[in-house]
From Swiss-Prot:
It is found in: Cytoplasm. Keywords: Cytoplasm, DNA damage, DNA excision, DNA repair, Excision nuclease, SOS response. SMART domains: GIYc, HhH1. Interacts with UvrB in an incision complex. This is UvrABC system protein C. The UvrABC repair system catalyzes the recognition and processing of DNA lesions. UvrC both incises the 5' and 3' sides of the lesion. The N-terminal half is responsible for the 3' incision and the C-terminal half is responsible for the 5' incision. Residues 208-243 form the UVR domain. Residues 332-352 have a biased composition (Basic and acidic residues). Residues 16-95 form the GIY-YIG domain. Belongs to the UvrC family. Its main location: cytoplasm. Residues 332-357 are annotated as: Disordered. It comes from Corynebacterium aurimucosum (strain ATCC 700975 / DSM 44827 / CIP 107346 / CN-1) (Corynebacterium nigricans).
């Protein structure tokens, strides 16, 4: 690791102008590119107290061996140069939104002499037009099946095409009319390309001419009594309608917009983008990236809270995504020009693609950090005005919320995929063992969290993970009694109370029946023993690792309880607001886990689960308290009689004004119960 003080620029040598900077490692490779309104202010942050830096930023600064910068005239130029350098150097510490290789697409090989349509996953290739991406592989295949009803074109691979060309007879699709069989000369290459052009035009949204043409042919066939042909054309219309249903109208006709939403935590961020063209969703894409640099946050992002790093995430994404899109569009235009020079009019019926890469509207959750500068850069790329904004109401707001839900689901599925990976779970437990100096991997981990609002309804959760997976049957919930009440709350005391209640019978729970005693146990005695064990199952397995919510004070409180109870065989740690900081009893400094480690991901999962259970229980208790009534404590008064009383008098206030005789008139109430209710209501 390099020493940042050795390459720190001399005081006063960094300009205060806007610019772009590069960190290089000892081999002169660029490892991070950033931009700044004020280079001196930004770069100085990297050379302050290194322990205060975000872990990934700290790793970058320690990996670097030098820093250099370039001054530019404006913040807009800084944005453009930053993107150029990121593309050129591919720095390891920058967030890169690369094409998602997992999404299936419909591809058309326009560069071939006899183009074909096919299902495709992978990086984009020259001479191929792509449509999608689609959410599922079956959606591509279904679309391709419907498209070949209307546009019978080649879908086979080169080997299949060559074989049937040699045989002189078409494949099955050629016989059933889903391919125009250019392999045997049924149509010329020019006629086949005309069919391909019509398909591309249709997929670009130009559906009306195709529908009109098929409808006209169907009516003509019916007039000429060609009912079999008319029926087939009717089915073709049905296929067109089904294809259009897959791109349902979600916004007014003529609306061209991209809707972008993020879902993030302190480690990763998922982004989803919906492409809406002429009011229909034409495509959807998604990525999950590790947060770093300006987009990283060190604090826990609570559910429902605004992510402070969101504007930086959005800004980085907009510049990268649309710059890449325009560059790709230019490459496709250059390929089209080459084909045209060869005398191939491969898109005479297609919609013009100029300007399609960046729509007129870009709808986001929050404006980017430097909204005006980003807008200028995007307008230069598009060559026309654009509107980057946050929709506040109506259909656009509703659709953006749908995009956000997709992003949340994507992040959730990404986490579940990691949780379900046995190798990743094993690595996480091994990393925890090494980081905490444990004798063995913590196969059973328990984590507690406190939840309350201004000292009311203070509760705690205790979640249990075994082999890295939740064991929900062992979860426990506590109402804090000693450390809270009357609107007061003591988080440190609450942690101590939960720890004491959890481990009060720790030594008793560990006792087992000796083997020699078991040998002389009858079947009946064994059944009684098993039944008793099942009733105390929740506490019968002590954890190897116990995690408390909080930093050094909370850990010290839990350790005091451990000392009081004589517990020495359970490792204790605390998770502070900075997730990667793991506090160990007696240590002045926290243990720092690598940000991309499986151990940190497991701790995040534990903390989130404990937080979820605590919040849920707190809401339940708060709701129960708000529904409670002064009648709940009246002895002998059940739910039905309480309801009858309130229904009879209209409210508790009017009930208090009633006499014993009036209460006794209510059905089911005698003089004795009426007197009890009256005395209870007027006891104060």
């Amino acid at each position: 690791m390099a020493d940042p003080s050795k390459y720190r620029p001399a005081p006063g040598s960094i300009p205060t102008d806007p610019g772009v900077y590069k960190f290089r490692d000892e081999n002169r490779r660029v490892i991070y590119v950033g931009k700044a309104k004020n280079l001196r202010a930004r770069l100085s942050n990297y050379f302050q107290d290194i322990t205060q830096l975000h872990p990934r930023t700290r790793q970058m600064v320690l990996t670097a061996a030098s820093v250099e910068w370039t001054v530019v005239a404006s913040e807009v130029e800084a944005l453009q140069l930053e993107y150029t350098w990121i593309k050129r150097f591919d720095p390891r510490f920058n967030v890169m939104y690369r094409d998602d290789k997992t999404y299936p697409m419909l591809a058309v090989s326009v560069g071939e002499s006899i183009p074909r349509a096919f299902f495709y996953r992978g990086p984009r290739r020259k001479g191929v037009r792509y449509f999608g991406p689609y959410s599922h592989a079956w959606a591509v295949r279904e679309s391709l099946d419907l498209l070949t009803r209307i546009f019978p074109m080649r879908t086979c691979a080169k080997g299949v095409f060559n074989r049937h060309e040699r045989l002189g007879r078409p494949c099955l699709l050629g016989y059933i009319g889903k391919c125009d069989a250019p392999c045997i000369g049924r149509v010329s290459p020019e006629e086949h390309r005309e069919t391909v052009n019509q398909l591309i035009s249709f997929m670009n949204g130009n559906t009306a001419p195709v529908r009109k043409r098929v409808t006209q042919r169907m009516e003509e066939a019916a007039e000429n009594l060609e009912f079999e042909l008319a029926a087939r054309l009717r089915d073709d219309l049905g296929a067109i309608d089904k294809l259009m249903e897959q791109q349902a109208v979600v916004l007014p006709d003529g609306t061209d917009a991209d809707l972008i939403a993020f879902s993030s935590d302190e480690l990763e961020a998922a982004v989803q983008i919906f492409h809406v063209r002429t009011g229909r969703i034409r495509g959807q894409r998604g990525w999950v990236v590790e947060r770093s640099g300006d987009q990283a946050t060190t604090d826990v992002v609570e559910e429902g809270q605004a992510d402070p790093g969101l504007p930086a995430l959005i800004q980085n994404f907009l510049i990268q995504f649309y710059s890449d899109a325009v560059e790709r569009q230019r490459q496709e235009a250059a390929e089209d020009a080459k084909l045209e020079r060869r005398g191939v009019d491969q898109e005479s019926h297609a919609e013009p693609r100029q300007g399609n890469a960046i729509p007129r509207e870009i709808l986001v959750q929050a404006l980017p950090e430097e909204a005006e500068e980003v807008k200028i850069v995007l307008e230069e790329l598009r060559g026309a005005q654009i509107d980057v904004r946050v929709p506040q109401r109506g259909d656009k707001r509703a659709l953006l919320e749908t995009v956000e839900r997709n992003a949340k689901e994507q992040l959730k599925q990404h986490k579940l995929k990691r949780v379900g990976d046995l190798t990743a779970r094993s690595a996480a437990l091994q990393e925890l063992q090494e980081a905490l100096g444990m004798d063995s991997a913590p196969l059973r981990i328990e984590c507690t969290d406190i939840s309350h609002i201004q000292g009311t309804d203070v509760v705690a959760s205790l979640v249990v993970f075994e082999d890295g997976l939740p064991r929900k049957s062992d979860y426990r919930r506590y109402r804090i009694k000693e450390a809270a009440g009357d609107g007061r709350s003591n988080d440190v005391g609450s942690i101590a109370e939960v720890t004491r209640r959890r481990f009060k019978h720790h030594h008793d729970d560990k006792r087992a029946v000796p083997d020699e005693e078991l040998e002389n146990t009858t079947f009946a005695e064994e059944m009684v023993r098993e039944e008793a064990a099942s009733q105390t199952k929740r506490s019968s397995y002590p954890p190897q690792l116990f995690i408390v919510d909080g930093g050094a004070p909370q850990v010290a409180a839990a350790q005091a309880v451990f000392d009081e109870l004589g517990i020495v065989d359970v490792t204790l740690i605390g998770l502070a607001k900075r997730l990667e900081e793991v506090w160990v009893p007696g240590d002045d400094e926290p243990v720092i886990l690598p940000r991309n480690s499986q151990a940190l991901f497991l701790l995040q999962h534990l903390r989130d689960e404990a937080h979820r259970v605590a919040i849920s229980y707190h809401r339940q208790q708060r709701s129960k308290r708000m529904r409670s009534s002064v009648l709940d404590a009246v002895p002998g008064l059940g739910p039905q009689r309480r309801t009858d009383l309130v229904k009879h008098f209209g409210s508790v206030k009017k009930l208090k004004e009633a006499s014993v005789e009036e209460i006794a008139e209510v059905k089911g109430f005698g003089p004795k119960l009426a007197q009890t209710v009256f005395d209870h209501l007027h006891a104060s």
